[in-house]
Amino acid sequence: MLRRSASREGAHVLIDTYGRVATDLRVSLTDRCNLRCTYCMPEEGLQWLAKPDLLTDDEIVRLIDIAVTSLGIEEVRFTGGEPLLRPGLVGIVERVAALEPRPQMSLTTNGIGLRRTATALKAAGLDRVNVSLDTLRPDVFKTLTRRDRHKDVLEGLAAAREAGLTPVKVNSVLMPGLNDDEAPDLLAWAVEHDYELRFIEQMPLDAQHGWKREGMVTAGDILTSLRTRFELTAEGSEERGSAPAERWLVDGGPHRVGVIASVTRPFCSACDRTRLTADGQVRTCLFATEETDLRAALRSDAPDEEIARIWRLAMWGKKAGAGLDDPTFVQPDRPMSAIGG
């Protein structure tokens, strides 16, 4: 990847020195979650962000407004922790939907609260949801998440579909010895219920720092397993671009399955994302070890133009890649729950 000169090409977009332009903003609304997934959080002992450190609803909407009107952001995805635990979520969505230009809005969730919120979120302006579900077996779900809420997730998925938050996407992480035999069953279930299934390689973002590359279920493993039951055809001839998922038609279509090979086939060269943590820090990458503080600028009454300048400068320094293959790779201190997916 070639670097650009320091001329700051594209002064009104979030461009980096490799020419990548961020148009997709991930906003973490909380670091708290009502599950304890083994690949994300420890069972106990996490230090939560203090309430005064969290961005307020007004601060979140203001930063999104700056991103959309001054920095070229076209899509906003709300994440967590678990974003449905944020009391003001529906109001935030409604206010962002009123921005000009209006960004596309989606939500990544564990689905537990969707049964009671899906209709309100759709009415407020949310476009679609991504729901995490790694298994069809309640006992395995309890082992993976340390909570007995499998039925709630299934009901939440159904509620999202009925509310029109479509396409409903389901994200699944396969873990060796736990659910790595479920790929074909998960796909058959997704096809039956008209959900779009995406398998994601486990990434080194667990709070315990116990991830090992040699122990993960790879994209290749997943595709091999799926092909024992389904005919998979690579969708179209277009390059993958900034889309993280390699998509396949299932038995000739119309249903599709995606595989996100974040570790074995990373898409860093086409990354179009910028991330905002629940306490107002800009992160250029899931695996970044540096952050840029926007909360301090907000609370010191900095004008929008200054906040946009700080944000552009942060993204200008984005690294070429996550560096997972680099022997010097260091896992971020923040676990996934405190970064936002």
UniProtKB/Swiss-Prot annotation:
Domain annotation Radical SAM core: ranges: 17-235
A GO BP annotation: Mo-molybdopterin cofactor biosynthetic process
SMART domains the record matches: Elp3 (SM00729)
Subunit structure: Monomer and homodimer.
Protein name: GTP 3',8-cyclase
UniProt cross-references to NCBIfam families, sorted A to Z: moaA
Species of the source: Streptomyces coelicolor (strain ATCC BAA-471 / A3(2) / M145)
Residue sites binding S-adenosyl-L-methionine per the record: 39, 81, 132, 203
Metal-binding recorded as keyword: yes
Xref: Pfam families: Fer4_12 (PF13353), Mob_synth_C (PF06463), Radical_SAM (PF04055)
Functional note: Catalyzes the cyclization of GTP to (8S)-3',8-cyclo-7,8-dihydroguanosine 5'-triphosphate.
Uppermost EC category: lyase
